[in-house]
């Protein structure tokens, strides 16, 4: 999902939230809100996972202490040679 799509998604979620404060949402609006929220969370989680998988952790002594799970993900992406 690109930046513009995400902005539109958030805008529509916020519109539905505003409407819900003024009146009850229709069944169609409730379903739309549910789908939009699900899409937003899926995109957020994917971005967060990407960020975590690309992170290298170094302790105060300069030794890498990245988790094995993260190292494996980095190897699959071709970011690590070891």
Curated annotation (Swiss-Prot):
Keyword terms, alphabetized: Cytoplasm
Keyword 4Fe-4S: no
Region described as Disordered: spans on this chain: 61-82
Superkingdom of the source species: Bacteria
Subcellular location per the Swiss-Prot or TrEMBL entry: Cytoplasm
Cysteine pairs bridged by disulfides in the record: none
Gene3D superfamilies: Helix hairpin bin
Database matches in Pfam families: DUF896 (PF05979)
HAMAP family assigned to the protein according to its UniProt record, in alphabetical order: UPF0291
Family matches, as PANTHER family: UPF0291 PROTEIN CBO2609/CLC_2481, UPF0291 PROTEIN YNZC
Family under the similarity heading: Belongs to the UPF0291 family.
Full protein name: UPF0291 protein LJ_1507
Taxonomic source organism: Lactobacillus johnsonii (strain CNCM I-12250 / La1 / NCC 533)
